[in-house]
Amino acid sequence: MKFENANVLITGGASGIGKIMGRMALEKGAKCFIIWDINQEGIDATKKELSKYGKVAGYVVDVSNNEVVNLAYKKTVEDCGNVDILINCAGVITSNKTFDQQTEAEIVRTININTIAPMFVTRAMLPDMLQRNCGHVCNITSAGGMLSNPRMSVYAASKWAAIGWSDSVRIELQNMKSKVHITTVAPYFISTGMFTGIKSPIIPILKPEYVAKRVIRAIERNTSFRGIPFGFHFIRFWQFILPTRIFDWFFGEVMGIYHAMDAFTGRK
C-alpha cells in the first residue's frame, strides 16, 4: 500500500522504530503520522522533532485497555480522518527471569501489551477499513515468536500468539476477497533501549533504521510475512528437519541465542 496521502497510525510511535517509521512515512508523503503512546513527554518531543516532515498528531493511549482504545480511535478519526495504515509496534519485555520467577504482574503486562493490545487496536479500526475496502495493518511481532528462548518465555509466548493471530486474520481477509492487507513482521533483536544488555555473538543485533526500512517496504509491497533478517524465514524448516538436541545445540551453543538474555537489563 502506498504511503502517499495516507493517515498512518503507529502504536508506540513516540520512540524506537515506531518513531523512525513515522518519519519515513512522512518522507513518503503521508498525510499525517498519528502517534499512540503511553508517554506524553515522548509524544511531545516526537511531534516537535518530526513536524518539519509533515503533520504529526499524538494521543496518550493505553493500548491494553479496550475502552480507552475505542474512545481514542473515535477522537483520532474526528481530528485526523480515517486511518489508512495501522502499525502495531508497541511492545514490552519485562525481565530476564526464568518462568518460575516471573510475577503475575509481569506475565499479565507482557501478554496484555504484546498480544491483546494489537487485537484491541486492530478490532477498533478494521471495520472501517473493511467498509472502505481499503487499508493495511502491520503487526510487529518478533523472531522470538518463532524460536524458543530461555529467560524470555512469556515474551516468546506473547509473540507466538501475536504471529498466529495476525496471520490468521490475513487469511480471513483473503477469504473475504478484501483489499485490506495484513503484514506480519518478525525481527531479531533490535538495538533500542527495550533490548539493552542483549548479547548476540554471531547474528548481528539489528539497527533500528534497517528494520524500519524493511517494514515500510513490506507494507508498500503488501508482503504477508517478513522475517528480519531474511534467514529467519527458515527457522521452522530447520525445527522440522533437525532432531531437537541438534537444533538446540546449534542455535543455543553455536549461535549463542539461548544465552542472549543472560545480561539483559532492558529500558530503565
Predicted ranges, named:
Residues K97-F99, T103-V108:
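Substrate-binding pocket helix/loop in short-chain dehydrogenase/reductase
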Residues A30-A45:
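Conserved glycine-rich Rossmann-like NAD(P)H-binding loop of the short-chain dehydrogenase/reductase
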Residues S142:
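Residue(s) in the substrate-gating loop at a strand-loop-helix junction
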Residues T184, S200-R236:
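C-terminal helical subdomain
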Residues T122, S158:
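Active-site helix of classical SDR
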Residues Q40-E41, V60-A72, E104:
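The beta1-alpha1 cofactor-binding region of Rossmann-like NAD(H)/NADP(H)-dependent oxidoreductases
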Residues M1-I34:
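Canonical Rossmann dinucleotide-binding motif of NAD(H)/NADP(H)-dependent dehydrogenases/reductases
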